[in-house]
Amino acid sequence: MLYLYNKHPRIKLRNAAIFDNINRVTVSFYKYIFIHEPIKFRNSLYRMFFKFNIFGRVYIANEGINAQISIPKKIYHKAINIITTSFAVLKDINVNLALDNRESFWVLRMKVRKKILFDNLPIDFFDPNNVGTYLSAKDVNNMLENKNSVLVDMRNHYEYKIGHFDSAINVPVNTFREQLFHIVDFLKHYKNRDIIMYCTGGIRCEKATAWIKYNGFKNVYQIKGGIIKYVRDARIENLLVKFRGKNFVFDERMSEVVSKDVLSKCDQCENLCDTYVNCFNSRCHNLFIQCNFCRKKFHNCCSEHCFKTLLK
């Protein structure tokens, strides 16, 4: 019998993944499309992913699907082809290849939610057919030469800290819901300029551009495929990569290196550093930037208090 969930402890699954010696490809995709029976769709997709030994995190809702997954490299093309041809809602999805293929996931988690991306707004404003105009890497570089363009980073502030475009502005909050709440007022002085939004892979900018268009902004654009596709395409096309630092990702890798520039500081000693870690104290698990010196000094913890808590 196939269980449509993980019945093994996380540590066991992680150890199994570490020692399986399977080369993997990390990809992401999303699609805003109406899914009539999300639970039924979820169970069918889970069976297929299980068959292909795919790990990752997938959210499904009536409004669509959002997936970050790790596929065995030797069956990557076969798996993507079968997945996209077996389900009508996945036809023509844009698959975003990660910028590096270090181990990203060791377990498959697939959940049905109210929304694939929570916006916490009181009105149903989102129309996937009325979003910002998509820009290629070349388009982005050209538009950034124009002083009328305003580049807006729609990621959380902790993501922005370790990597961003030089000219980008960012609402200093830690959730997308907060960003949407503040963004219209934040951009009110730029309403007559060209607004270019970007995020990690594009999903947040679909809603963000739709929201500001709903609120009267006219010249609204978004980077197609987000940072990931921009960097990959710019490298392939030998364009200047204008994103600097690291691209924060929500998996075991924590980040992808785009350039050698270090834009942030250690949260404990304030020396240059862009390495995110979680506090070793499981009751804290705080996400913070920590250099090697402080990692040793504080024993992988975010504070002396957390380290002393572990000793009790």
From Swiss-Prot:
Q: For this chain's UniProt record, which GO biological process terms are given?
A: tRNA modification
Keywords from the UniProt entry? Oxidoreductase, tRNA processing
Q: Which residues form the Rhodanese domain?
A: 145-235
Q: What is this protein called?
A: tRNA uridine(34) hydroxylase
Positions of the catalytic residues? C199 (cysteine persulfide intermediate)
Give the similarity note: Belongs to the TrhO family.
One GO molecular function term of this record is: oxidoreductase activity, acting on paired donors, with incorporation or reduction of molecular oxygen
EC code: 1.14.-.-
Q: Which reaction does it catalyse?
A: uridine(34) in tRNA + AH2 + O2 = 5-hydroxyuridine(34) in tRNA + A + H2O
Q: Which PROSITE patterns does the record match to this protein?
A: RHODANESE_3 (PS50206)
According to its UniProt entry, what is the function of this protein?
A: Catalyzes oxygen-dependent 5-hydroxyuridine (ho5U) modification at position 34 in tRNAs.
The record ties this protein, via CDD domains, to: RHOD_YceA
